[in-house]
Regions:
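Conserved alpha/beta enzyme-core scaffold
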Residues: 1-359
Length: 359
């Protein structure tokens, strides 16, 4: 998965074969050193792709009701039954969360520890993120259910929704900003068509803010990817707004979310699962959001040809958002898509992009 441990580094590649679905976190340095084997699959398929597992290492929390998966349930839950050996670390500082439970009968080895869970904090929100957030905020209706990724852009989006009412959350990951928005009453989950009153997620990805908020809080449930990412579940959520990122998008709507500068730094991940879910949702909005440029403004992220793989095909593209506006590609032919994509590119690159598209 997305590794945060210092043990995941190129220096250990001689002793450990590193394999992951993503090039994020500590994986990035291993990937840039060409020591990371990539497993390109959708999040819904990850547990099956990893099965069978020889040894499964889990960190859990213990309470009167039993063992909770604590910070992360997601693809770990289905692997418990198939793993040859399940090693469990019971951390008394881990939040005890509602949702999935670990059956004591499935534990082979148990170790008790006491250590603060790892914390991940996003970069500061800048003007570009705020501009993108304003565009997205104009699309979101009161009562919508949101799925967001992690980082400064999703946090900017949530910040920009403070005047909205009765928002819901059904997401792969949630962080401190979700806890803050629940505490102030913007996120109530009261109008969700399924799981009313409950924020549903697969992993807590933040700091003490979300850990303290989620601890023994029945309004937050940690669920397996078999639930959080399943199309059959997502299609039942009315007004599902999914907001994911990309490295670059071409003029037809093809999305590269995996490779930048020749290195694997992203993932296929859950973006496609959620995009398809939003397409299937009544009133849903499948959104891909990204800054218009990279490398200090010297490279356009709206391109005429992708420099990496097609993580999402153009047939599944929905709305593309940059700081310059929204390109709704749904129902558009290729020529109209190109026009709309050029319009949200940085002004310095629009002429060249239009010329490449024959506009």
């Amino acid at each position: 998965g997305l590794s945060l441990s210092d043990a995941v580094c190129p220096a250990h590649a001689a002793q450990v074969q590193f394999q992951s679905y993503c090039g994020s976190g500590r994986n990035r340095a291993v990937s840039r050193a060409s020591k990371l084997d990539i497993l390109p699959c959708h999040y819904t398929q990850l547990a099956k792709a990893l099965d069978p597992v020889d040894v499964l290492l889990l960190q859990v929390a213990e309470g009167p009701e039993g063992f909770s998966f604590g910070i992360a349930a997601e693809y770990l839950v289905p692997l418990v039954k198939s793993a040859r050996l399940v090693v469990v670390e019971v951390n008394d500082q881990s939040p005890w969360t509602h949702g999935e439970r670990l059956d004591p009968a499935d534990i082979d080895l148990l170790v008790r520890t006491s250590q603060a869970p790892l914390e991940v904090h996003s970069a500061a929100i800048g003007d570009v993120e705020r501009a993108i957030a304003r565009h997205i905020g104009g699309l979101v209706e009161d009562g919508s259910t949101l799925q967001l990724g992690m980082g400064s852009l999703p946090e900017a989006v949530l910040d920009g929704l403070r005047s909205h009412r009765d928002l819901g959350i059904h997401s792969g990951a949630i962080g401190d900003k979700v806890a803050e928005m629940m505490a102030c009453g913007v996120i109530t989950n009261s109008r969700k068509s399924i799981d009313p009153g409950v924020t549903v997620a697969g992993v807590l990805f933040g700091g003490q803010g979300i850990y303290r908020f989620a601890h023994r809080n029945s309004q937050v449930q940690m669920r397996s990817t078999a639930y959080t990412h399943a199309l059959s579940v997502l299609a039942r959520i009315d007004r599902l707004v999914t907001i994911n990122s990309a490295i670059e998008v071409d003029l037809t709507g093809q999305i590269n979310a995996e490779v930048a500068g020749g290195a694997y730094v992203g993932a296929v991940g859950g973006a496609m699962d959620f995009l398809l879910g939003a397409h299937a949702s009544g009133g849903g909005l499948p959104i891909i959001a990204l800054p218009a440029t990279a490398v200090g403004g010297s490279q356009s992220r709206v391109v005429d040809r992708l420099s990496g793989p097609v993580s999402t095909p153009r047939a599944d593209a929905g709305l593309i958002v940059t700081e310059y506006g929204v390109a709704d590609l749904r129902g558009c032919n290729l020529r109209e898509r190109a026009r709309r994509m050029v319009a949200i590119a940085h002004p310095d690159f629009r002429e060249a992009l239009a010329r490449a598209a024959g506009l």
